[in-house]
Curated annotation (Swiss-Prot):
Function: This is one of the proteins that bind and probably mediate the attachment of the 5S RNA into the large ribosomal subunit, where it forms part of the central protuberance. In the 70S ribosome it contacts protein S13 of the 30S subunit (bridge B1b), connecting the 2 subunits; this bridge is implicated in subunit movement. Contacts the P site tRNA; the 5S rRNA and some of its associated proteins might help stabilize positioning of ribosome-bound tRNAs.
Gene, per the UniProt record: rplE
Keywords, sorted A to Z: Ribonucleoprotein, Ribosomal protein, RNA-binding, rRNA-binding, tRNA-binding
Lineage: Bacteria, Pseudomonadati, Pseudomonadota, Alphaproteobacteria, Rickettsiales
GO cellular component, one term: ribonucleoprotein complex
Domain of life: Bacteria
GO molecular function: rRNA binding; structural constituent of ribosome; tRNA binding
Species of the source: Wolbachia sp. subsp. Brugia malayi (strain TRS)
InterPro entries reported for this sequence: Ribosomal_uL5, Ribosomal_uL5_bac-type, Ribosomal_uL5_C, Ribosomal_uL5_CS, Ribosomal_uL5_dom_sf, Ribosomal_uL5_N
Name listed for the protein in its UniProt record: Large ribosomal subunit protein uL5
Family label: Belongs to the universal ribosomal protein uL5 family.
Complex and partners: Part of the 50S ribosomal subunit; part of the 5S rRNA/L5/L18/L25 subcomplex. Contacts the 5S rRNA and the P site tRNA. Forms a bridge to the 30S subunit in the 70S ribosome.
Length: 177
């Protein structure tokens, strides 16, 4: 649905709004990166299994493990230890995930008022975090041992934050400012 929405109406409206000469200049979504850090994975090798499976259910794609770049004694982490998992979504899976995120997960998120414009990085990319991964319907609350958060990065081809915000607003992203 989101892919058709982009192709049928968003491209035309953004082309008119920003006076692009060609539809290839219209910003588009490139990829969505989802990262889930796991605090106990450094000491317990089995601690990564549950978040790994949860991220697989949420994204619909097999995640990869992330490893520590250097040792930090305060966190009891050694270089090369597994510290989390991540997945990169593109094309149809990206649009399907964003649809579930906007219409299902964000309305179920506690104390969620909307996103801030300050969450853009200056290059047209948007990053935010979700405090509870149980906001997604794919996660069964009774089968998890711990509620975890996740970081979501949306990469666009927009040249500026203003263009990226208009693109995300067209996809019904909730901004409060």
């Amino acid at each position: 649905m989101f892919k058709e929405l982009y192709r049928d109406s968003i491209v035309k409206s953004l082309k008119d709004k920003f006076n692009y000469g060609n539809i290839m200049q219209v910003p588009k979504l490139v990829k969505v990166c989802i990262n889930m850090g796991v605090g106990g994975a450094a000491t317990d090798n089995k601690a990564i299994n549950e978040p790994f499976d949860d991220l697989y259910l949420i994204a619909g794609q097999k995640p990869v493990s992330t490893f520590a770049k250097k040792s930090i004694s305060g966190f009891k982490i050694r270089k090369g230890a597994t510290v989390g998992c991540k997945v990169t979504l593109r094309r149809d899976k990206m649009y399907e995930f964003l649809e579930r995120l906007i219409y299902v997960a964000l309305p179920r998120e506690k104390d969620f008022r909307g996103f801030s414009v300050k969450q853009f990085d200056g290059n047209g990319n948007f990053s935010f975090g979700i405090k509870e991964h149980i906001s997604f319907l794919e996660i069964d609350y009774d089968k998890i041992s711990k509620i975890r958060g996740m970081d979501i990065n949306i990469v666009t081809s927009a040249a500026s934050d203003k263009e990226a915000k208009e693109l995300l607003l067209a996809f019904k992203f909730p901004f409060f400012d």
